[in-house]
Every structure is written in structure tokens, then in C-alpha cells.
């Protein structure tokens, strides 16, 4: 075999060996692939709480003289955003919608607004809400039946206050007072003040 051929084969073997060594070194120094990490998204619900209960309709007014009672229901939605600390979060309200149906055919109404809930202890809380309501009550400025409240117009302003206790992780019980009036925007402004109790289920 010619010397040039032997030299060529030697160079080829040396190159192959060198490339193999480089590949081995690269394999040893290459960082191991990262383990796949499970991304857990925070659980949230569009609906925050459901409430239902009973109330006495305007017990000190015309519609309450016959012990008029209502069936009530309310949906509270999740807060639009969360605050970084607990105190600030109390100022972020939950939107709500609800309704009240009278068993004796007196004033029914539907409402919407904002609710602020403040924890006094882990089990005890207070809350307030503001909003508006539409109703089918008396709006006749000339004559109001003696058993009806003169509400003047629709919609009305609605305010409510509650005190409540958490019975379990998801269940709560609260006493609520609500008031509806037109704030003097109509000639008649008797208004309605209802008191009652509600049960809430949180998601």
C-alpha cells in the first residue's frame, strides 16, 4: 500500500475519532431536559353565591297589614378583580341581581346592584348593597288603594343591609333589611321596607 494511502486512512481515522470524542463531551456537558411542570390555574367561578329566603313585605306599611310575605332570590357574581390585601379587598364589591315575588299579589320587583361584604370574624360578617329595582307596584298619582304603597314611579333606588353567620364552608345564614324608594324623584314616595332571612350557598 502506498504511503500516501496509509497517511490518508490515518487522517480519516483520526477525524472520526475526534468527532466521536467531541460528540461524547457535548453529550456529557449538555444540561438534562427540564421535567415538564404542571401549570395549575387558579379556580374561579363566574357566579360567587346563590341566595334564597323569605321576607315580610313592608310590615309597618299598607301592604304589610295582612302579613304579606315574599319569596326572595339573589345571585352574586365574582368580584371583577382581587386586591393584594384583605382590607383593600373589602372595598371591591360583588355585582348582584335578584328578585322578590309576593305571595298575595302585592308588589313584586327585580333588582341589580353592588354588594360589599366585610368579615368581622371568620364566622360572622356584615354587608351592605346599593342598586336599583323595577317593580309592578302602585304608580297611580291620583288614587292609591288603601292596601297598597304609593311608590310613585319605576325604577326605584334599593339599599339593603345584612348581618350573617357562616354555618359551614359553603353555607351561610343572614338577616336582611331592604328599602326601596324613588328618592323624591316622583310625587309619591311611600317606599317599601322589607325584613327577612336568607340562606346563601357560596361556590
Feature names for model-found ranges:
Residues 1-43:
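Cleavable N-terminal export/targeting peptides
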Residues 48-52, 93-97, 124-130, 173-175, ...:
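Transmembrane beta-strands of outer-membrane beta-barrel proteins
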Residues 128-160, 164:
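Outer-membrane beta-barrel translocator/channel fold
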Residues 57-61, 80-82, 98-104, 135-139, ...:
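Sequence/structural signature of outer-membrane beta-barrel proteins
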Residues 59-67, 99-110, 120-122, 184-190:
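Solvent-exposed loop/turn segments connecting transmembrane beta-strands
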Residues 75-79, 101, 116-118, 165, ...:
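Residue-level signature of outer-membrane beta-barrel architecture
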Residues 69-75, 191-203:
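Outer-membrane beta-barrel "beta-signal"
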Residues 80-85, 122-126, 167-175:
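Repeated loop/turn-to-beta-strand initiation elements of outer-membrane beta-barrel proteins
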Amino acid at each position: 500500500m502506498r504511503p500516501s494511502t496509509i497517511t490518508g486512512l490515518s487522517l480519516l481515522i483520526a477525524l472520526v475519532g475526534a468527532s466521536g470524542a467531541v460528540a461524547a463531551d457535548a453529550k456529557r456537558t449538555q444540561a438534562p431536559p427540564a421535567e415538564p411542570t404542571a401549570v395549575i390555574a387558579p379556580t374561579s367561578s363566574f357566579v360567587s353565591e346563590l341566595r334564597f329566603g323569605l321576607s315580610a313585605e313592608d310590615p309597618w306599611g299598607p301592604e304589610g297589614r295582612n302579613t304579606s310575605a315574599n319569596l326572595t332570590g339573589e345571585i352574586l357574581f365574582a368580584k371583577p378583580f382581587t386586591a393584594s390585601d384583605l382590607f383593600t379587598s373589602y372595598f371591591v364589591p360583588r355585582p348582584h341581581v335578584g328578585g322578590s315575588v309576593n305571595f298575595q299579589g302585592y308588589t313584586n320587583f327585580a333588582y341589580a346592584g353592588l354588594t360589599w361584604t366585610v368579615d368581622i370574624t371568620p364566622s360572622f360578617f356584615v354587608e351592605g348593597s346599593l342598586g336599583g329595582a323595577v317593580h309592578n307596584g302602585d304608580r297611580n298619582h291620583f288614587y292609591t288603594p288603601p292596601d297598597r304603597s304609593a311608590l310613585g314611579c319605576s325604577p326605584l333606588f334599593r339599599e339593603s343591609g345584612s348581618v350573617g353567620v357562616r354555618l359551614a364552608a359553603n353555607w351561610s345564614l343572614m338577616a336582611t333589611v331592604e328599602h326601596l324608594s324613588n328618592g323624591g324623584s316622583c310625587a309619591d314616595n311611600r317606599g317599601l321596607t322589607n325584613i327577612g332571612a336568607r340562606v346563601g350557598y357560596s361556590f
